[in-house]
Amino acid sequence: MKTIMAKPGQVERKWYVVDAAGKPLGRLSAGIARILMGKHKPIWTPGVDCGDFVIVINAEKVALSGSKELKKVYYDHSGYLGGQRVTPAWQLRQKKPEQLIYRSVKGMLPKNSLGRRQITHLKVYAGPEHPHQAQQPEKIELP
């Protein structure tokens, strides 16, 4: 019996919609990363982008457990001396709620060119509306 190795032209991509309202950030992000990588498919191949597209709605209502809302911080750096910026999670939720999910999922993807391509298949929206109705996305439930 031969092992099936998928080629980039053989991969069929689907679109999924995930509602983030009230879901824990880490569990939600792990499920989304799994779909983006394509690990839920039997033809998953390590070096090939086998993943599907994921649309996340209600990103502003994602749950952070415990005191993470106040204590969790996100670091950025401008590249200049003294250019480090620290943003707490509560402030990031007010300004750019999509970034909470985006950063969490990006950290769970491979740190190479394949991961950079896979993160482009993630579409995150703060509210319940999204402009991707033409793709006929399928609604799925993640823990």
UniProtKB/Swiss-Prot annotation:
Gene Ontology molecular-function annotations: mRNA binding; structural constituent of ribosome
Keywords of the record: Ribonucleoprotein, Ribosomal protein
Secretion signal, residue range per the UniProt entry: none
Entry GO terms, CC: cytosolic large ribosomal subunit
Coiled-coil residue spans: none
Pfam families (alphabetical): Ribosomal_L13
InterPro entries: Ribosomal_uL13, Ribosomal_uL13_bac-type, Ribosomal_uL13_CS, Ribosomal_uL13_sf
Top-level lineage group: Bacteria
GO-annotated biological processes: negative regulation of translation; translation
Family: Belongs to the universal ribosomal protein uL13 family.
Role description: This protein is one of the early assembly proteins of the 50S ribosomal subunit, although it is not seen to bind rRNA by itself. It is important during the early stages of 50S assembly.
NCBIfam families hit by this protein: rplM_bact (TIGR01066)
Quaternary structure note: Part of the 50S ribosomal subunit.
Name listed for the protein in its UniProt record: Large ribosomal subunit protein uL13
Organism name: Coprothermobacter proteolyticus (strain ATCC 35245 / DSM 5265 / OCM 4 / BT)
